[in-house]
Design a protein with these regions (language model features):
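Nucleotide and nucleotide-moiety/phosphate-recognizing core
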Residues: 2-158, 163-181, 188-189, 195-202
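Cationic, low-complexity basic patches in intrinsically disordered or flexible, solvent-exposed regions
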Residues: 205
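Short, intrinsically disordered C-terminal tails of secreted or membrane-associated proteins
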Residues: 214-217
Length: 219
């Protein structure tokens, strides 16, 4: 398999409680929004099928989906978190396997998918990357039938990913990569850091930031 054989499911809930506003449409330093950056990079990586699993009815979501040729599905049950996005996305997927990716990970390296693909076989339902022992369920491969378990769990009131995953056949795959690839934009501070990194990447001479470990100050 290659990325072209997968569906990319972008999980884009709308609560953003820690951000204080809808982070999906926050402008990044390069002029894109957080969500449009993920969709563009996914399309560039070679995914032919993209599902945008989002919460809420917003004109911007419809326009974004149309711009990147994505199929927009909205969560049937609001405020159910990423579990609902996974369930809705897998129900809409037409391929056997999908990459589920959080819409707030602006630096994810789509080449990592090639490391996961060899594990997607047999009875395995989820290929779950781990980083320093921590699961990365919003950057994992899911077999289409895993969506039924997510839908059933939500129906009985369980929406924690860890609980649902323990009921599936999971293949964990430790990765030795830069933790920044899984960086989430969840807070205003994280947003500022992401914008700074993107701006720095566009400079001919990147600005070096050095922080003192004791005081946290830097130059």
């Amino acid at each position: 398999m290659t990325p072209a054989d997968l569906t990319l499911i972008v999980a884009a809930g709308g609560m953003s409680t820690r951000m204080g506003e809808d982070k999906r449409f926050l402008p990044m330093a390069d002029g894109e929004t957080l969500l449009s950056r993920t969709l563009r990079r996914g399309r560039t990586a070679g995914f032919r099928a993209i599902v945008l699993a989002a919460e809420g009815e917003r004109r911007e979501l419809t326009e974004l989906a149309a711009a990147y040729g994505a199929h927009l599905v909205t969560d049937d049950r609001p405020q159910q978190g990423p579990a609902a996005a996974i369930a809705a996305g897998l129900a809409a997927a037409e391929t056997e396997w999908s990459l589920v990716l959080s819409g707030d990970m602006p630096f994810y390296d789509f080449d990592l998918v090639r490391a996961l693909l060899p594990e997607a076989h047999g009875a395995v339902q989820v290929v779950l990357p781990t980083l320093a022992g921590y699961w990365q369920p919003l950057a994992a491969l899911y077999r289409r039938d895993a969506g039924q378990a997510f839908a059933a769990a939500i129906a009985r009131g369980d929406r924690k990913l860890g609980i649902i995953l323990r009921g599936l056949t999971v293949r964990e795959l430790p990765l030795a990569v830069d933790a920044g690839l899984f960086f989430n934009v969840n807070t205003p501070a994280a947003y500022r850091l992401a914008c700074g990194r993107i701006a720095n990447e566009g400079r001919e001479r990147p600005i070096l930031s050095v922080a003192a470990p004791a005081s946290g100050t830097g130059k």
